[in-house]
Design a protein with these regions (language model features):
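Multi-pass alpha-helical transmembrane bundles in non-GPCR membrane proteins
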Residues: 1-161
Length: 161
């Protein structure tokens, strides 16, 4: 049945994109809390968790309910807000962190994003190639972003303890 296949694809897309929103919601909550902590008003663990869950549910609901560019715009806004808090922390409260993992994250994400755009706009797209496609490269490169984020946040945890 075509309707069931379509629903399965839609669910797969929501799960696929949902992982991106979990990732960016995590960075946004962590960076917001770091920024607030520097201002002596950090969030409790409970409030961090509530904010993370709320952002995640809201973001994934937006993707599930709206097709098209709404989800892309929301993701971009969350990236910008998370990056804003990180840049404010760097600018005002620089604690001599090693920013190499964060820079590598940005580079890998930028390359992955560029490949994703080339794939989604069908600029570079071979639908007969079932071995590797732009979307697959997007996922592979983004998997390294998790490693780089871990390495970056691990040093912050070490400094704060």
């Amino acid at each position: 049945d075509v309707g069931e296949e379509f629903d399965g694809l839609w669910v797969g897309e929501v799960v696929d994109v949902g992982a991106m929103y979990l990732f960016i919601a995590f960075t946004l909550v962590i960076n917001l809390n770091r920024w607030l902590t520097e201002k002596n008003s950090g969030l409790s663990k409970h409030n961090q968790l509530l904010l993370f869950i709320s952002l995640s549910i809201f973001s994934i609901a937006v993707v599930a309910l709206f097709k098209g560019t709404v989800g892309i715009i929301l993701f971009a806004v969350l990236v910008i807000v998370s990056g804003h808090f990180e840049s404010e922390i760097y600018r005002k409260y620089n604690k001599g962190l090693n920013y190499k993992p964060l820079i590598l994250l940005i580079v890998f994400f930028g390359i992955a994003w560029g490949i994703w755009w080339l794939d989604i706009t069908k600029t570079v797209c071979d639908q007969n190639n079932h071995f590797i496609q732009g979307h697959a490269i997007w996922h592979i490169l983004n998997s390294f972003c998790f490693l780089f984020l871990y390495k970056y946040y691990k040093q912050i945890s070490s400094i704060n303890n």
